[in-house]
Structure formats: C-alpha cells, structure tokens
C-alpha cells in the first residue's frame, strides 16, 4: 500500500473512532432518562462533533458522521441509508456482517455491516415496536411492515443460527403502472390493453408466479383499471397494495395471534367479513391455504372482477395448487366456474420480470380443468447486453367465454 493509501486508511479509522465515541456519549446521555426531540438530538450531535479537537473534519465528513449517528439512534442504523436509496428494491440482512441488496433485479453484497449483534437486535426490536408487535426467543418469527409500508420479515435466534435475519421489501409511494411495466418490457401494449378490458368487464383474474417475480406489483397495476365508482375491499397478510384514485376503498389486514395464542384474525376471517360489506370487487393479496374456498365462493356468488395472486410454476400449476388447497369433492367445478383468467409471471435469466402466459380457464371437461392460452411469451434469443429478447405472442384471437366482455359492450375478444 502506498503513502496515500496508508493515509486514507488511517483517516477512516480515526473518523470511525470519532463516530463511535460520539454515539456512545449520546447513548449514555439518553440512558440517563433525558427525553429529547429529533431537532434537539441533531443539535447535540453537531455540538459533539464540534467539540472533537483531535481530528480536523471536512464539511462532508461532518455531515456523514451526523447522518450515521442520527440513523443509529432514531432510524434503523446502517439500514437507514439503504432504505432511502430508491435504486434498492430489497435489503437482506444475514447476521451482523452479511448484508445483501437487490438493485435492478440483481443481488449485490453491501459494504455496510452492524457493529455487533446487540445493534442488529436493537434494530429488529425497533421494527417490531413500530407495529406494536412482539419478537423474541419465544416468538422468533415476525412478518410486519415499516411505517412507509415496506414489508419486513424478521427471524431471531435460536431459529436463525448466525444471528438475527431481517429481510425488507421496499415500498414505493408511486407504484408501477401498466404503462411503466410496458415500457420495461414486462408486457406488450396489446396484452396490457386486453387485460385492462378484462378487468373493466369484471373477469376474475389470478396472478401466478414464483417468489419475487412481481405478482403484487402486477396486481397493483391491474387494480387501477377497476372503475372508480365501484366499492373495493382489499385483504392482505401484510399491507402492500397501493390502489390509487379509488374513492370507495376498504383495506383489511390479517393479524397474528398474541403471545397467549389468542385474537388471531386470518385471511379467511376477513374474507367472510368482507362479504357482509357490500363489495363490488374483492382483492386478496395472496391465496395460500384454506381461504381459497372462501375466495372461490365469493367469485361464484356475484363478486365478479375479483383479483388475487398465488405461488406456482405455471398457469396449469396454479390450478393444481388451488385444487390441493380446497378440501372438497366439487373443487374442480368451483375453480372452473370461478376463475376466468390466469396471468403467469416469471423471472428470466437476465433477472428481468415478464408476463409469460395469459390463459383462459375453460369449463370442466371430463373431470379436468382445461386452459386455453391467449398470450404466450416467445423467446427470440439474447441481445448483446445479455438481455433476454422476445415478446408475448397472441395464440387465440377470441375468448371462448366472452359473455362478460359482451355485457360490458367490449368487442373484438
């Protein structure tokens, strides 16, 4: 290492020592029981920085120290800066030393780390406190969200062997519209227009795909096609949906049981309650289990235009998974009569997210539920930049069950 390298390394160590020292002094002050406002905390930090005579700090260095200390005390420590970076979509903390980020669909290692397990555990407790929830060794798993709506999963020891694990899927004030998804190549303009008409006409639509393929984002985009004069009820495990410009909107969120195992409110409970709330449309963030029967019954009893998502490897697999969720001999008939369309999403080799198939669910035939592909992604190779090239190709000119389109005055399908 040359002289400049030694100098920079030595300076970074001095700045780190200064930052840690100021933070410790302020923590001691807070431990004495003094309640201070954010404004006063900022003033105290600046005063402490000015008092440090053993190192001359540039303005940029002073501001950096101020931000770090404020985030450690009032925010989420080293995660705060990452949360404020709009280019980051997901933050994964695997113990104190390993932090990974998702940026533009790709994972990368972050240079930041937590000083010790106590600091990381403190952040986990702060997140839990925001939603008035409990997470500890007895209850080591928590799914919750931050004040801005970002979804958070926390797993603590002894379940997490290498220390607390925190995963944050960030929430954006401005959700992706179908126009932006079209611009990103996730769907063609023609297929997007077809889905817009299907939503307006009241088709029941399931969005399927694997983890992280953008199901909730796509559900958000489709929900904005719902006519503005309709009453919408959303039901979620953890609130993520961002339906804009809906005047008559009711948002419901499930609740885990308390430490005594009581007061749980499930998706199924909320679905049953929603049917007594005069909904025009019911949107369920994700169907995972027994609530599938209630969702299918709602779709079959006049609540057309309902939307939901589910984990699956294909549109056909989504049907199979629904069959296993519903303990009923007549389940296939219920599925065939309830669901009109399945939109299947996937992540490509280049990490991009695309609509891979739009399929129509047909009436039961010989005890099976047939699917009819309307659009299908056709890969056409790879570009020089490594991007997967291709487009959604229309496989069927018209819908077999087009009664809802006709009733809505929509032709051409």
What residue ranges belong to the model's regions?
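Walker A (P-loop) phosphate-binding loop of P-loop NTPases
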Residues: 212
């Amino acid at each position: 290492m040359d002289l400049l390298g030694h100098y920079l390394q030595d300076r970074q160590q001095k700045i780190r020592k200064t930052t840690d020292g100021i933070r410790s002094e302020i923590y001691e002050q807070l431990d004495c029981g003094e309640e201070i406002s954010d404004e006063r905390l900022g003033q105290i930090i600046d005063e402490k920085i000015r008092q440090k005579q053993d190192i001359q700090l540039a303005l940029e260095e002073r501001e950096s120290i101020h931000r770090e200390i404020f985030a450690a005390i009032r925010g989420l420590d080293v995660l705060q800066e990452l949360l404020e970076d709009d280019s980051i979509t997901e933050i994964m903390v695997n113990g104190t030393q390993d932090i990974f980020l998702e940026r533009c669909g790709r994972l990368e290692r972050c240079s930041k780390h937590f000083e010790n397990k106590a600091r990381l555990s403190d952040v986990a407790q702060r997140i839990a406190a925001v939603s008035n929830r409990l997470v500890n060794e007895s209850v080591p798993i928590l799914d919750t969200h931050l004040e801005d709506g970002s979804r958070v999963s926390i797993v603590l020891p002894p379940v997490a062997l290498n220390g607390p694990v925190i995963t944050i899927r960030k929430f954006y004030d401005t959700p992706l519209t179908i126009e932006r998804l079209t611009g990103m190549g996730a769907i063609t303009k023609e297929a997007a227009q077809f889905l817009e008409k299907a939503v307006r006409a009241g088709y029941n639509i399931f969005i399927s795909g694997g983890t992280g393929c953008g199901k909730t984002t796509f559900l958000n985009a489709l929900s904005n096609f719902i006519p503005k004069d309709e009453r919408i009820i959303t039901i979620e495990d953890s609130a993520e949906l961002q339906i804009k410009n809906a005047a008559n909107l009711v948002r419901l969120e499930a609740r885990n049981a308390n430490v005594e195992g009581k007061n749980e409110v499930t998706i199924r409970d909320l679905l049953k309650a929603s049917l007594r709330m005069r909904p025009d449309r019911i949107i369920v963030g994700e169907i995972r289990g027994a609530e599938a029967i209630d969702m299918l019954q709602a779709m079959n009893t006049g609540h057309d235009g309902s939307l939901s998502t589910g984990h699956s490897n294909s549109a056909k697999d989504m049907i199979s998974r629904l069959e296993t969720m519903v303990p009923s001999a007549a389940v296939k008939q219920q599925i065939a009569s309830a669901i009109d369309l399945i939109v299947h999403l996937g992540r490509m080799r280049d990490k991009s997210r695309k609509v891979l198939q739009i399929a129509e669910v047909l009436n039961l035939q010989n005890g099976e539920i047939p699917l009819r592909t309307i659009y299908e992604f056709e890969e056409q190779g790879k570009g020089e930049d490594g991007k997967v090239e291709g487009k959604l190709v229309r496989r069927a000119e018209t819908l077999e069950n087009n009664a809802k389109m006709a009733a809505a005055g929509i032709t051409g399908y």
